[in-house]
Each structure stands twice: as structure tokens, then as C-alpha cells.
Amino acid sequence: VLSSLGHAVEDMGAVQAIPVRRVVHRNLALKALPEISAWTSAISEAAYAASEDAMPIFLGGDHSVSAGTVSGLARRAAATGRPLFVLWLDAHPDFHTLDTTASGNLHGVPLAYASGQQGFAGYFPDLPAAVDPSRICTMGLRSVDPAERRALNEAGVIVHDMRAIDEHGIAPLLRDFLAHVSAEAGLLHVSLDVDFLDPSIAPAVGTTVPGGATFREAHLVMEMLSDSGLVSSLDLVELNPFLDERGRTATLMVDLTASLMGRRIMDRPTRSHSGSF
């Protein structure tokens, strides 16, 4: 699909695992902490390397992969002297720390880790550069734990839950955020979780939450991102093919990516957006 849109595409293959070191935390609910810590390090290095002269698209996996992608991209942004912004499209903010997560599922911590929240030192890889929480926009939230709500407010993350989208519409909320990115000449990473979408159109995810983005809302987000010319990297995460219905969730994720990368019904004036992916 991307090739048909005129983009040069190279499959970089799977990230290679690195040795796992023993890590023990007082929160005994944490699942696979040593393994995810090791994968975070490996993915971070891969993201840093892949973002040198191209727009990387990272395929998960659950959302824990974004602890690695975002931290690696933040390091790249710091090396180029530009700020990294993150658009987090998700039913959940994934803003737990290792201490606050009751489930122990580490796909609930990546945004807290990548933004430099406390409690990860000694357990996750050190952060060469953290994302400024005020440059993070979460959109589509509809399942937020009390500890996450407090942390989001204290950190200053931009939060647009589904009520805000219902009240104001998704376009003006996204337009305001993109204006901030543009004003600071920032790099923009988009992290798209399948559960951002309503489960009626995207059932292939293990963490479905009713009331998500509609088909047209999701495509509008991608079309606006494409028009902006600001996106520098992309996560596609949480797709579970075993839960899909004749591949319709996978097809939708491909179509959304195509909208982000320039597929449109009619031509519109946009900023130049071309290169290798």
C-alpha cells in the first residue's frame, strides 16, 4: 500500500532480543519485568537507528513496545536539537508506574516511563532524553485508573477523553495540538493502539473498551496528520489476529496507515511530505 502511494519502503525485520538481566521489584504483581526491560533497551536502540534518515513504522506487539520506541525517538530528537511530541491514540493513558500498576501489566506503563516519571530507575533502561509531558497529547481515553488520573494532571499531559471529543469534535482538538508541534518545529510520533477504535469496528484487541473512535473519526485524525506533514514516526500496536473477524481489524489498521501516508479521496493543498519509510 505504501509503495503504491509513492513511498520507498524497506522492511528492517524484527528487533533482535538481548540478554535478560535479573530484575526484582517490590510490586510482586509485575509481569515479565526482566524480559520487558531487556526488550525496551533493544527496541530503543532500533528506534534511534531507524529514525536517523527515514520515518520508521513500528509494528507491535502490545503497547509495552512503545517504552522502547518513544525513548529511542526522544534520544534522536535530542540529538537533532528538536523537541519530540507524542500523540497517544488509545483508550488508556498507559501512565502507570511500576509502583502504581495493580494489574502488573507493563503495557500500562510506557508513556510514564518515556516521559521520565519516577520509579523506573534501576528497573528499566536509563533515559538519555525524556519526553516533556506537556508535549504529549492523549486522545480517545475512556479507561483511566485513579492513580493515572492524578499523575496525568500533575505532569501536565494534554488529555482529550471521549467526552471532550463528543463535546468539541475531534478535529479542533487535534488541530490545536498540531499547531503546538508546528510552532516549536517539533518531531511528531504517533502511537496508535487498536483500542482507540470502537470495538464494533476493531474487535481484534485484548483490551476492548466500548465507546471508542468511529471509522470516520479515526480516518479524519489520520487525514489531518497527513495534511500537517509533521509526523516523523508511527507505532501500530495491540492487534491480536486471533481475536479478529475475517481480518477486518487488520484491514482497518492498514487503511488508517494509508490515510496517514497520503491516500485521499480528492487532492488538497498540503505541506510537502515525502521520503523513505
Which residue stretches match the model-derived regions?
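Catalytic cores of soluble, metal-dependent hydrolases
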Residues: 1-58, 65-69, 75-79, 151-277
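Short, structured patches in soluble enzyme cores that scaffold and shape functional sites
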Residues: 88-91, 115, 140-143, 161-163, ...
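Internal, well-ordered alpha-helical segments in soluble enzyme and binding-protein domains
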Residues: 91, 107-110, 132, 148, ...
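Short capping/connector residues at structural and topological boundaries
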Residues: 100, 116-119, 132, 202, ...
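Aromatic-lined glycan-binding groove of carbohydrate-active enzymes
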Residues: 133-135, 142-148, 184-188
